[in-house]
A protein has these predicted regions:
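N-terminal, polar/Ser/Thr-rich
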Residues: 13-41, 70, 476-482
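Zn2+-dependent metallopeptidase catalytic core
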Residues: 44, 186, 190, 197-210, ...
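A surface-exposed beta-strand-loop module
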Residues: 67-140, 144, 183-187, 224-228, ...
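Beta-strand-rich binding/interaction modules
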Residues: 71-73, 206-215, 472, 489-493, ...
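Extended, low-hydrophobicity, Ser/Thr/Pro/Gly-biased non-transmembrane segments
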Residues: 99, 116-243
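Juxtacatalytic substrate-recognition/specificity segment
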Residues: 248-347, 351, 355-359, 364, ...
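Amphipathic alpha-helical substructures
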Residues: 294, 413-505
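Acidic/His/Gly-enriched intrinsically disordered linker/tail segments
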Residues: 349-433, 447-450
Length: 584
């Protein structure tokens, strides 16, 4: 009935409901968490901006379905609103409590409003959204572990449990990547949004006060006057879209061993020490590339049988026995975020993944790094295939160009594309330019100067002009194909190959490579003989051919294009045999 009432109200007012019309530019919230109950109560103020192209008469506010709206005020006066359940897997319950607020007057494009809000309710562990698509109960519980309880509290926010108000279209786990795309779109809209939060944590006694851990900038917890069993903390987030707020609370002990802070349960002291030691061992490589860390890596122990979670420099995980080298590669990701906070996902996540590959290379050589990256290659190929198919369905050239731009690295809301393709982009740039230009660009990055999408590419170009001027000539085309537009992936094959014996001894291997794909790249071309292997790098434009000659001491037997460091749509045709003095 409530949904019908909302529809009737909207029809009467003559407007359609655009759930994502408004961006929440600032949150100023006070929340109280009572683990024994387990209740969350919240009050505060929201500032919203109409980012749509049309005047808006309605505002949508959504919270987890186990929370209830208590009041919504505009200019200190109650406003008319209707609440309804809204099916969406952005919350662990599979449903949101949605308030559709009718404003007294339209808000024009770029106009702003402020609302005072209050809501409250329990936050139990709930895996309904996973169970209804057939996930076994134990696996569902291991993934959806957000809850408020006496022993452990965790609130991960949008995409897990919506404990602060949001406004999004519905998303379903049964619809492919719809959840990650919707969350990615929300993050993109809220990159410049901030949150000021006062958290009050009630405990059974002052002696048993749990530690509150978050990924925000928080002050010390202090007891409220006359209420020693309630401790309050002020926390701030400058960019909700970059690292959405996460809160965790339990009876943790803290091990501080730079660059790590490890919050652990009683009895996990040895494991906590191991994790801190591995973080310390992984840090020198990150400092070599990024400079000094700007914040510590925070590792928080989760209850057993739960799935790890990471965001930025925060890593939540059961403290299991893990292979040291594997953990070293994993923690390199958090260390990269601790060294450099960037507002662009393809850089922040791409660089973090790239440094994991570099750490793999440091441990076991280049092929180890390539194998690490190739774990993400198959899904990347599928994503690019789907993006190109969508673009090709566009009616005209302008629409296709717009589609290519929408799924480009600088614009994508797909976190997988930003991290996986971004990782490959940084590896290819390293192969083109060398280590030093990238390291200098990372160290020279200034967040307050990063106002345009080409800021980081300009830093790289300036460095490359000094140390690798020949390769720098290809940077503009590289960024156009791989970053500013989504041209898909290259598809290399060897069009012709022959070996000629030289008069002064040895052989000259001539290899012509054709790129059937839409993205240009510099790729390795390898000549092999019985007891010899040599490699040269060749720039191959999209849908063109290029030729390279490789001198070798003995008769070449095989030629290969791409050692796996360049992602391409088809690697099944990259190796051909070589016959002396004959063209293939």
């Amino acid at each position: 009935m409530k949904q019908i009432a909302v529809m009737l109200l909207l029809s009467a007012c003559g407007f359609a409901l655009d759930r994502e019309a408004f961006t929440f530019t600032n949150y100023d919230l006070q929340i109280r968490i009572e683990p024994a109950t387990p209740l969350l109560t919240a009050t505060g103020k929201l500032r919203l901006r109409n980012d749509s192209a049309s005047p808006q008469r309605a505002v949508v506010l959504q919270i987890s379905s186990t929370l209830d709206w208590k009041s919504i005020l505009l200019a200190n006066k109650p406003v008319q609103y209707l609440t309804q359940p809204y099916t969406s897997d952005l919350d662990h319950t599979g449903e949101l409590s949605e308030a559709v607020v009718t404003l007294p007057r339209e808000v024009p494009p770029k106009g702003t409003i402020e609302l005072d809000i209050a809501y409250a309710g329990a936050v139990p562990q709930d895996a309904t959204r996973l169970e209804r698509i057939g996930t076994p109960k134990d696996i569902a519980a291991a993934n959806d572990w957000d809850r408020i309880s006496e022993s452990f509290t965790a609130l991960r926010g949008v995409g897990y449990v919506v404990w602060y108000p949001v406004a999004t279209e519905a998303a379903s786990l049964s619809e492919g990547d719809q959840i990650s795309e919707t969350v990615g779109r929300w993050k993109q809209r809220h990159l410049a949004s901030s949150l000021s939060l006062r958290v009050s944590l009630a405990t059974s006694s002052a002696a048993a006060a749990p530690a509150l851990v978050s990924n925000g900038t928080c002050g010390a917890a202090v007891a409220e006057p006359g209420r020693n069993s309630v401790r309050s903390t002020n926390c701030n987030w400058k960019s909700l879209g970059l690292e959405p707020p996460v809160l965790v609370a339990a009876n943790y002990a803290l091990l501080e061993r730079p660059p790590a802070r490890v919050y652990h349960f009683s009895g996990s002291e040895a494991a906590a020490s191991d994790y801190a030691n591995v973080a310390a061992a992984a840090a020198p490589l990150v400092r070599e590339w990024m400079g000094e860390l700007r914040r510590p890596v925070t590792i928080v122990e989760l209850p057993a049988e739960t799935t790890p979670f990471e965001t930025g420099a925060l890593y939540l995980t059961p403290l299991r026995v893990v292979d040291t080298k594997t953990l070293e590669v994993f923690l390199t990701h958090q260390l990269a975020h601790a060294a450099l906070v960037l507002p662009r996902a393809w850089i922040s996540e791409g660089v973090a993944n790239f440094l994991q590959a570099v750490q793999s290379e440091r441990q076991a050589g280049r092929m180890s790094a390539i194998l690490f990256m190739q774990k993400q290659l198959r899904p990347l190929i599928e994503v690019e295939k789907n993006n190109l198919a969508t673009a090709q369905k566009s009616a005209g050239q302008a629409q296709q160009a717009a589609s290519n731009a929408a799924t480009s690295l600088i614009n994508t809301t797909d976190p997988f594309l930003a991290s996986s393709k971004g990782m490959y982009v940084w590896w290819m740039l390293r192969d083109m330019l060398g280590d030093r230009p990238l390291q200098n660009a990372f160290r020279g990055y200034r967040a307050d100067e990063d106002r345009e999408a080409n800021y980081t590419p300009r830093l790289l170009a300036a460095e490359a002009q000094v140390s690798a001027p020949q390769e720098a000539a290809h940077l503009e085309q590289f960024f156009d194909d791989w970053v500013y537009r989504d041209r898909g992936l290259p598809d290399f094959h060897i069009a012709s190959v022959y070996a000629r014996q030289m008069l002064n001894g040895g052989f000259l291997l001539t290899v012509t490579v054709e790129n059937l794909g839409g993205a240009a790249a510099e790729v390795a071309v390898i000549g092999r003989a019985k007891d010899e292997s040599d490699s040269r790098r060749l720039w191959v434009p999209a849908r063109q051919k290029a030729t390279i000659r490789i001198p070798m001491r003995s008769q070449p037997t095989e030629a290969q294009v791409n050692d796996g460091s360049v992602p391409e749509s088809n690697m099944a045709n990259n190796v051909v045999p070589v016959q002396s003095n004959s063209q293939q």
